[in-house]
Amino acid sequence: MIWKRSAVLRFYSVCGLLLLGSQGQFPLTQNVTVVEGGTAILTCRVDQNDNTSLQWSNPAQQTLYFDDKKALRDNRIELVRASWHELSISVSDVSLSDEGQYTCSLFTMPVKTSKAYLTVLGVPEKPQISGFSSPVMEGDLMQLTCKTSGSKPAADIRWFKNDKEIKDVKYLKEEDANRKTFTVSSTLDFRVDRSDDGVAVICRVDHESLNATPQVAMQVLEIHYTPSVKIIPSTPFPQEGQALTLTCESKGKPLPEPVLWTKDGAELPDPDRMVVSGRELNILFLNKTDNGTYRCEATNTIGQSSAEYVLIVHDVPNTLLPTTIIPSLTTAPVTTTVAITTSPSTSASSSSRRDPNSLAGQNGPDHALIGGIVAVVVFVTLCSIFLLGRYLARHKGTYLTNEAKGAEDAPDADTAIINAEGSQVNAEEKKEYFI
């Protein structure tokens, strides 16, 4: 009797110790998120374990691994690490059906468990843009739709035009047939103009399964529009005798056909001097009869457009032509004559026969050179006249011939010199003789 009572006490003591030790053992797990087709790692850890077994089971409560022993025949499930403190397994090529709550069990008294939820992300398919039919006419309303399927959770769609995001769009989300993924679509409405031609409209799909590389679809717009026309002259102030080139700059889609040039609403009056080469109108030897309104017309399959240029031919500037001056050393007065010719005073007949290259050599530097030469000649002439006058003034006075020197009343040489240079007292007695 005593022996039986002692055995019972020992049994309860051992059970109490086991129960007390198991209270400090807890399995630890973490939730896992993986992209569809990826590999999930499920880890269960126990900090204090007295050689108690660990087990992983799937959402259907099927045992996957018991310690290091594989229980379910699934080639996708592999053992990563097995010890008394850790049991880790991997599930490769994860599908949406693998999502759910997995259980790690620690076989103590009682059994302790920890849950880990496996989240599988559905990767959205490459988006597709629909609704564009080329070409689109300028001013039309365009509607583009971007669509993607297979995302879980639902993906986000964003629109960009010229690298600028468009906010005002419509968004629609629908659940797929498997009731796990979503189909998302977005519609963009806008009115196009010629500036949209060649512009890329981008639909971008953002989703957490794509990391930093979003999926995109691009649509390049093709817009047809009427031509725009502008006339560019080769010189801003055309003059008589010059040549003038008018360039008709036209832009349109389709590209405009060869342009049409007219003057004052009619054909060009002088085809010999007014030559059309492509988009250019070349007018040779301008004259006043060329004045008028020139019109350039450009046409494509969408429409027609034109531009006008009013031509005013200016007169040739006045030209100064000085005459050559020959200096003279005589006492006669010197007269300087400058001849000025003006083109407006010439007759109509002479202007019509004028050589357009006759004024090519008369420019600013030649006029300055001629003016400088004239100034030097005038200065030398004036200096010569002044010196000649001084010379004549100094040699003016009384001079005696040889016959006069023998007369009784003839003054001596010294007196004659003095009278020639000094002041004269009696003007009536002086006589002038020239040798």
UniProtKB/Swiss-Prot annotation:
It is a single-pass type I membrane protein. Residues 27-119 form the Ig-like V-type domain. The chain crosses the membrane at residues 368-388. It comes from the Eukaryota. Keywords: Cell adhesion, Cell membrane, Cell projection, Disulfide bond, Glycoprotein, Immunoglobulin domain, Membrane, Phosphoprotein, Repeat, Signal, Synapse, Transmembrane, Transmembrane helix. Disulfide bonds join C44-C104, C146-C203, C248-C296. GO terms for cellular component: axon; GABA-ergic synapse; glutamatergic synapse; neuronal cell body membrane; postsynaptic membrane. Glycans are attached at N31, N51, N291. Adhesion molecule that engages in homo- and heterophilic interactions with the other nectin-like family members, leading to cell aggregation. Important for synapse organization, providing regulated trans-synaptic adhesion. Preferentially binds to oligodendrocytes. This is Cell adhesion molecule 2. The lineage of its organism: Eukaryota, Metazoa, Chordata, Craniata, Vertebrata. The gene is Cadm2.
